[in-house]
């Protein structure tokens, strides 16, 4: 009887995990033989444990059935087996845990190593998707470890031990992620570029090269890089920035040009004189729209005395003599106006005598001078005091244009004489007509000109179309 009870206890410890053992264990005292046979059958196949059984029913079976067994055995035979049973179950649990621990630890360690290798070198870690993939991987690994613990362990102690082990593995993953983050931060610091500090010699050499050629070829860039001890990429970027700067300067300075070329010339000339422009500027159109800018008293006195041919520059800050031949070759929209710069005496003396503000006296004087000039041109002889014909476009007009100019000048003279109301304007006009000379060899400065009245400009002789075609319009 004792032998049978001992066998039943051993079979109970071995075959408790089968589903049928729990059902038949309550009828152990009634049908001992059947229980022994079924327990023997179950003991022959201990590996039929279903790995997908949840841990709670197993734990319940482990917690409830030994209580029944203890109660029945103690009541029947008065044997104290709880200590032995607990020691046996703890031995089994410890053996199972020791058998499962190394494998799970190696898997977790391998997973941590793999994740650390991947996350440190992968660029996905820097993106939000990579950061979201790390918790997903951790959750997957946790589920895998929990399923393994359910399949391989029979006590809650082993499950908690593996949970703590996996927690350590998760800590390893987080540590690897932190390491990868620090590595990416250091790489970003290394990629950051700082501004290149050019020396004065380097800037001077680059500016000189830019004046010579805005676009530099690659061989030339290589030569400059070797000469200036700079990377080729730096020189390329410098030339790109320099071209953009030049474009901005030209756009900023060219805003008055379509409406007023004179103001554009004035601004650009003064900018070149003050050193604001890095490139030389050649003034093409003289300054005739702004009489109040820099007109000197010396020029006014010289004009009043009638010495218009020898008058000095009317601008206080004269930059350079304005080349009238270059001005004539400039594609200006009204080339007939450029004749006035070859004949400053036509408008200079009467305007100065009238105080630079009397439009009537200026118109009268201009009418008289224009009448004299047109009559001389109609007679086929050069004007008085001139040894060679003028090179301006208006002086090379045809006979029809000269006749039209004479008619316009006569009409303008009658209108100007009525407006003057006195003989002073007429006297000044005759003086201006006598002083008028259409010679390029006259002893005067090339930049000696004064502004003229808009009424005179509107009545000036106009070149025929064939003459005007020589100066194309480039607006």
From Swiss-Prot:
PANTHER family: HOMEOBOX EVEN-SKIPPED HOMOLOG PROTEIN 2, SEGMENTATION PROTEIN EVEN-SKIPPED. One of its GO terms (biological process) is limb morphogenesis. It is found in: Nucleus. CDD domains: homeodomain. Gene3D superfamilies: Homeodomain-like. InterPro entries: Even-skipped_HD, HD, HD_metazoa, Homeobox_CS, Homeodomain-like_sf. GO terms for cellular component: nucleus. The lineage of its organism: Eukaryota, Metazoa, Chordata, Craniata, Vertebrata. This is Homeobox even-skipped homolog protein 2. Residues 160-186 have a biased composition (Gly residues). It comes from Mus musculus (Mouse).
